[in-house]
Regions:
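RNA-binding basic/glycine-rich loop and surface signature characteristic of RAMP-family CRISPR effectors
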Residues: 1-331
Length: 331
């Protein structure tokens, strides 16, 4: 095997170690009755990287393309003709963060990847095997509906797309064992040669500052669990403020440093109480009221021990935005 290129551009990978101790598996909260907090978190999602690409699985082509015009490109996801970010994409991205920072099971892995026995995917069998890791208790597992759901995110105002050229995306040749993989928020490296060529592809993306309206529905969650979700959305407590700690990445082409987003402008709608009348009467928190509620839940989360300290510190330090370019070529 030829030696690796010592001058190769650093890859934007983050490896978060899987702890040696197994997850804290407990009985999940179920759906027979309402307990804890039930409601919806409304917020904006703003593109923080140069571009965001959420693929539809389809492509378009221009039979008249010449010169540096793209001939074939992968399209952005749409619902009824409108640009959209599927709720499943948001849920998957946030769940992967929750799994990493709470020392939960590894729910998604490919055949041949070696996962420690202690962190194998949770299994739920009523009356036989009911204890689940923190992430599976929140997001669900086969046989048990989750308590957190994301709606499709729709554009705020008019959003223009752009066809951009990126290096081809290949499967990694080697997986790091005993680690979870994420992607850093580095700077997108624009290619000067726009012509179609082997080893590159074109994608339809939305640009920085594009905003989408999001909704996260939660049911029967504890304050600490809701605080955990706020941490996973990139929030961080700073004395009396809630600040951006890191930018989660969603969508495709993450190895090309696309997909970093910021969640903001929270509005919380809570339902609950001891009577049906109390439950049907929603309580809305906006502005400073919503921020104080976020702080309260995040404080409860820190006190609860839900977050695995060393995993969180490693993840947070590696996921902060970096003023470095992504590799331009194939890797």
């Amino acid at each position: 095997m030829p030696p690796r290129n010592p001058n190769a551009e650093p890859k934007p990978f983050v490896w978060v170690p899987i702890p040696s101790e197994g997850p804290q598996r407990r009985e999940p909260t179920t759906h027979e009755r309402f307990v804890g907090l039930t409601g919806v978190l409304e917020f904006t999602l703003t593109v923080n990287s140069a571009y965001l690409f959420v693929g539809s699985g389809a492509y378009e082509f221009d039979p008249n393309a010449r010169g540096d015009r793209p001939d074939v490109w992968y399209t952005f996801y749409r619902r009824n003709g409108q640009l959209c970010i599927p709720g499943t994409s948001l849920k998957g991205a946030i769940r992967s963060i929750v799994e990493a920072i709470t020392n939960s099971c590894v729910s998604q892995y490919k055949r041949g990847e070696e996962i420690p026995l202690s962190h194998q995917r949770c299994s739920y069998r009523p009356g036989k095997q009911e204890n689940l890791c923190p992430a599976c208790r929140l997001f669900g597992v086969a046989g048990l509906r989750g308590r957190v759901h994301f709606a499709d995110a729709i554009p705020v105002g008019r959003i223009e797309t752009e066809i951009i050229k990126i290096g081809e995306l290949w499967e990694p040749s080697r997986q790091e064992e005993q680690n979870r993989k994420f992607y850093q928020a580095k700077r997108y490296a624009e290619l000067s040669d726009k012509r179609p060529q082997t080893g590159y592809r074109f994608v339809e993306a939305v640009k920085r500052e594009a905003s989408f309206q999001c909704r996260m529905y939660f049911e029967n969650v504890a304050e600490a669990e809701l605080g955990l979700l706020f941490f996973a959305l990139g929030c961080e407590k700073d004395e009396e403020k809630v600040v951006i700690g890191f930018t989660p990445k969603i969508g495709g082409a993450k190895p090309r440093c696309l997909g970093a987003v910021v969640f903001g402008k929270p509005k919380v709608v809570l339902r609950g109480g001891s009577t049906l009348k109390d439950f049907l009467h929603a309580r809305s928190l906006t502005g400073d009221g919503a921020i104080r509620f976020l702080q309260q839940c995040m404080q409860k989360c820190q006190e609860s021990g839900l977050i695995h300290k060393s995993s969180w510190e490693k993840f947070r330090s590696e996921m902060r935005d970096r003023d470095e370019f992504c590799p331009r070529g194939m890797y």
